[in-house]
Structures are given as structure tokens and as C-alpha cells.
Amino acid sequence: MGQASKVFGKQITYSVSPFQQKLFVNYFKNAIPHLRRGVKDNFFCSVPYFAALYITVNWANETYHNEMKDHWY
């Protein structure tokens, strides 16, 4: 693919022209499996936070609407 290469000790680096690269190679093909795996791996870590957020927002909305009913002219 790329012709230019440099050797620094035991590390070999290759440089590729921007015209030889493909943008988002297999990005959309691999996005759904990666998303599914990420949700599955982090499900039990993130659910308590979303549950606490839902309970807090629900309580705040209910309190706000009850106060608005009391102050109705």
C-alpha cells in the first residue's frame, strides 16, 4: 500500500498517502455489533444511574406541577 517506510531501532513505521486510504472502512458494518457488546458489557453499571435520574426527574416534575396547581389563580 505505502512505499515510504522508516526503521527506528526495532520499530517500523509506514506512511500511507491520504489518497490511498479509505475513509470509515467497515465502520457501519461493525457499528451494530460493537454497540450491542458495549451495552451488554456496561448494562449493570449504567442502569442504576439512569434509574436514579428517572426517579429524580419524575419527582421534580410532579412537585413542580403540584405547586403550580396550588398557585392557580
Curated annotation (Swiss-Prot):
Keywords: Electron transport, Membrane, Mitochondrion, Mitochondrion inner membrane, Respiratory chain, Transmembrane, Transmembrane helix, Transport
Any single Pfam family the record assigns to this protein: UcrQ
Keyword Mitochondrion: yes
GO cellular component, one term: respiratory chain complex III
Membrane topology label: Single-pass membrane protein
Parts of the chain on the Mitochondrial intermembrane side: 61-73
Cystine crosslinks: none
Mitochondrial matrix side: 1-42
Family under the similarity heading: Belongs to the UQCRQ/QCR8 family.
Function description: Component of the ubiquinol-cytochrome c oxidoreductase, a multisubunit transmembrane complex that is part of the mitochondrial electron transport chain which drives oxidative phosphorylation.
Subunit structure: Component of the ubiquinol-cytochrome c oxidoreductase (cytochrome b-c1 complex, complex III, CIII), a multisubunit enzyme composed of 3 respiratory subunits cytochrome b, cytochrome c1 and Rieske protein, 2 core protein subunits, and additional low-molecular weight protein subunits. The complex exists as an obligatory dimer and forms supercomplexes (SCs) in the inner mitochondrial membrane with cytochrome c oxidase (complex IV, CIV).
Stated name of the protein: Probable cytochrome b-c1 complex subunit 8
Lineage: Eukaryota, Amoebozoa, Evosea, Eumycetozoa, Dictyostelia
